[in-house]
């Protein structure tokens, strides 16, 4: 679980850095829609970073399949949030990042899958953990 704790902390740190970057450097460079999309990526990255941290620290409440859910959540977060970041700043770059467009819904689908998989793998035999 320590690997996922490190991943979660990295997700949170990067989301704070990108939040500051967006608030101070990108606010005058991006359209309102692009900035809103950028913030969506940050929000999802932070929420899932915190979720991975909480789940990793409470791994005893889940079946041994928790690692699969955490891996899916990590992959989904990278695909979803980072594709949004690059698509949001596409007009600022000298090359197009529009090819990343399909990764956003794929990442979102993986995130949804990770939560459903997690739900299905909560220990049912111990009600003190629910």
Residue ranges and their predicted role:
Residues 1-130:
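Polytopic transmembrane helical bundles with strong interfacial aromatic enrichment
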